[in-house]
Amino acid sequence: MLDVHFGAGNIGRGFIGETLADNGFKITFVDVNDTLIDELNKRNGYTIELAAEGQKHIEVHDVKGINNGKDPKAVAEEIAQADMVTTAIGPKILKFIAPLIADGLKLRQANNNTTPIDIIACENMIGGSQSLKKSVYESLNEDEQAWADQNAGFPNAAVDRIVPLQKHDDPLFVSVEPFKEWVIDKSQMKNPKIQLKGVDYADDLEPYIERKLFSVNTGHATVAYTGNMKGYKTIGEAVKDDSVVDQAKHVLGETGDLLIQKWGFDPEVHHAYQKKILSRFENPYISDDIERVGRTPIRKLGFNERFIRPIRELKERGRDYSALVDTVGEMFFFNYPNDSESVKLQQLLKDEPIEQVIRETTDLKDEDLVNEIKAAYEKHLAAAK
């Protein structure tokens, strides 16, 4: 079987690629990074290291690469014969690869290939595959859309594995934590015959996506932003500070309250899940930079993102969200010149009053929440002086 995977980066190779290879798939990685594509084509394999005691190595074989910037036609031809398409490129990039996927579907139609294919966005976002579908359909006419409705599925997915920023002499070598979770919405699949081992299938994915987003992503970002306020540069340094861990525990307590109320998760099971998350952040074999975990703060301040959405929903339920608001106040101090959103955020803070910056970045219309975030920001500002 063949999977066309968009994104030859660390997550693509170290998580999605490993799982697919373990299921006997050949993988064609699609990327614009010449170095990665050239090495994949030269070696047809790469090594994954598990960041844990023993540092076990896993060898992945039967892979190749296509540079979509140089040879988009080859990408379409590969999709035309693929059994599955996956992505791990970041939510903002999905719309840019959509025309390539559309071309692949057009070619499948032209070749009368009616074998159903699922196209799965493995991104940190709610409704990733369905969002990708909308972008793909913009490049299809009515007849092509009708054909795709019958033959192409876009099942949403929830993915979870910490893959830190890293540099190695071997550009394909990647280190990942042992824990991994990949859940696919089986109700949206067109080819349910493909059942991957190491992947869970659910009728309703939203509880899993929110559990992951509001626990792992919110918790990890909390450690980054709180650690940043205290001058730490790595997550490893930050989690040695009890005050940082306490902040993460308070935040996870609030998001856990929401998740248990909203989705009916078993409290005991969920608290064990939260404990496991904190232990993953404390993994001594993973050296993750605060800059990587905290990057793109404007996106992370979004209305439906990891902080503002749980804040809104907790307020609606009359529950406590004070630790979440406190962390959002810290986000405005994230200042890394290599991160364009961080630079933009700092410029906004110079040009506009804080309450206007809060409204712009969060899309909040609730002035009480805007003022609560403003108060948190001003508290941190006073403490920093």
From Swiss-Prot:
Record GO cellular component, one term: cytosol
GO biological process terms, semicolon-separated: mannitol catabolic process
Annotated coiled-coil segments of the chain: none
Assigned keywords, A-Z: NAD, Oxidoreductase
Keyword hit for Repressor: no
Similarity field: Belongs to the mannitol dehydrogenase family.
Name of this protein: Mannitol-1-phosphate 5-dehydrogenase
Organism: Lactiplantibacillus plantarum (strain ATCC BAA-793 / NCIMB 8826 / WCFS1)
Gene name in the database record: mtlD
